[in-house]
Amino acid sequence: MAFCIWMTGLPCSGKTTIVRKLTENIPNLAILDGDELREWLSPKNFSKEARDEHQFKVAHLAKLLLKHNVPMGVSTISPYKANRAKAREIIGDDTKFFEVYVNASLAQCEERDVKGMYAKARSGEIKGFTGIDDPYEAPDNADLVLDTENKSLDESAAEVLEFLKSKNLL
C-alpha cells in the first residue's frame, strides 16, 4: 500500500538516516531526500522563495509517486508550517500522508553535523541556514514525533514502523 512519510526537522536531526533504516523493513520504499533532489530539481540557494519552490516540487513529485502506488519516505527540512500544510494539501488524502517531526535540539544537530554546515552558517559562509539565521517552525500537530535527542535512530525507525502498522499500511 502506498503512503508518504514526510519527515521534517532541523538539519542533522536524523531524517534521512531514519528513512534509509526503514528500507530494511520496507524494501520498496522510495526515498525522496531533499538534499539530493535540490541538486537537480530546485534552485541551489536557501532563500525563502527557493525553499518554497523546492517544497512544492517535492510535494508534487510525492503526489505523482502515490498515484502510482509507491510508498515513500520524504526527508526534507520543511522549515515552515505553511509549506508543510501546502504539501499536505498538494499530496492530499490524509490516510496516506503523515507528517513526522524528527525532534532534536540545535546543539545535538550541530554535534552530529559531519559536513560542517552549521559551522559554515555560523561563520557567515552560508546564508539562510535553518536553525542559525533562518527559523525552523516546529509542527504543532505532527502525526508522529520522534525524539532523536533521547532515542537512537534505530528506535526511531522502529517507532515509524509501529505507526505504519497501526494504520494498517504494513
Question: What residue ranges belong to the model's regions?
Answer:
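Walker A (P-loop) ATP-phosphate-binding motif of ABC ATPase nucleotide-binding domains
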Residues: 4
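Hydrophobic anchor at the beta1->P-loop junction of P-loop NTPases
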Residues: 7
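The conserved Walker
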Residues: 11
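Conserved lysine of the Walker
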Residues: 15
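Conserved substrate/cofactor phosphate-moiety recognition/catalytic segment
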Residues: 19-60
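Short beta-strand segments at enzyme active-site cores
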Residues: 31-34, 69-77
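ATP-dependent NMP and nucleoside kinases share a basic, alpha-helical "lid"
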Residues: 45, 62-68, 77-121, 128
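Small-molecule kinase domains that catalyze NTP-dependent phosphoryl transfer to phosphate-bearing small molecules
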Residues: 103-106, 111-159, 167-170
